[in-house]
Design a protein with these regions (language model features):
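Conserved NAD+-utilizing ADP-ribose enzyme module
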Residues: 1-69, 77-140
Length: 140
């Protein structure tokens, strides 16, 4: 298993990371909101974005919630298109990429496996030294 970002709390793996998260490969969609190309920077977790002051703390920000430390993806293109519409208000050059949550880059889990949510949202806890961008391409 790889190492998580240094900014993550010391108890992240023991107390926060869900037991069901595994190094697997799922086909997912991701909103690319930084830069105009698919780069490593576009695969940061919400926690990292807040720490780097790239975004304000969300209203429901909870440092004990596993999804705070994940990179959000979705298995359903229609759902990611909806969120792209919301995102474009603040990031007009954002676009959608498709790829895989390659296990060498981190563990992932369908959010619905641990919450009452439904749908194809995937939490992906990306390792600090991973290069997830190489597994993605722009959706035309």
């Amino acid at each position: 298993m790889g190492k998580y970002p240094d900014c993550f709390p010391d108890n992240f793996e023991k107390d926060i990371l869900p037991d069901g998260a595994q190094e697997n490969s799922r086909r997912v969609y991701r909103i690319i909101k930084y830069d105009e190309k698919i780069s490593r920077r576009n695969f940061m977790s919400t926690y990292e974005e807040v720490q780097l002051k790239l975004m304000p703390k969300p209203k429901r920000y909870n440092e004990n919630e596993p999804s705070t430390y994940s990179t959000s993806c979705n298995t359903e293109l229609s759902k990611i298109r909806y969120f792209l519409g919301l995102c474009m208000k603040h990031r007009p050059r954002a676009f959608i990429a498709v790829g895989t949550t390659d296990g060498s880059c981190g563990v992932s889990q369908l959010t619905s496996e641990r919450t009452k949510s439904n749908g194809g949202h995937v939490d992906w806890w990306v390792y600090a030294d991973a290069e997830p961008q190489i597994y993605f391409e722009k959706v035309e």
